Amino acid sequence: MKYSLIKYRFQNGSEAAWHRDIAEFIAALDGDPALKGKISYRCMKSRNGCDYYHLAAAADDQAIKTLQERPFFGQYRERTRLAGGGSVEVLPLEIVAETKAPA
């Protein structure tokens, strides 16, 4: 698995509309036969603030390549950039240790 953390501070637009955009992106991931089961995606935000954290996991490099070829990915990436006021950080992650059964 390949993991990435996407983080930014929400700065533009309606938070409710942004949450709908995120849900639509996740639905597109789940609905794409070539990506289903190969990409995991979660979005979280700080409870008392405007900081957002997206955790993405891909089964392999091919899943990432396939995702990057999808028009919905480019559109979502641009919307994320706009939501973050042009400042979005993407951090590749590696697991150091984990429980046997992920929650």
Give the residues covered by each predicted segment.
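Short S/T/G/P-rich N-terminal loop/turn motif that feeds into the first structured element of a domain
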Residues: 1-70, 82-103
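Long, charge-enriched, surface-exposed interaction segments in small proteins/subunits
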Residues: 72-73, 77
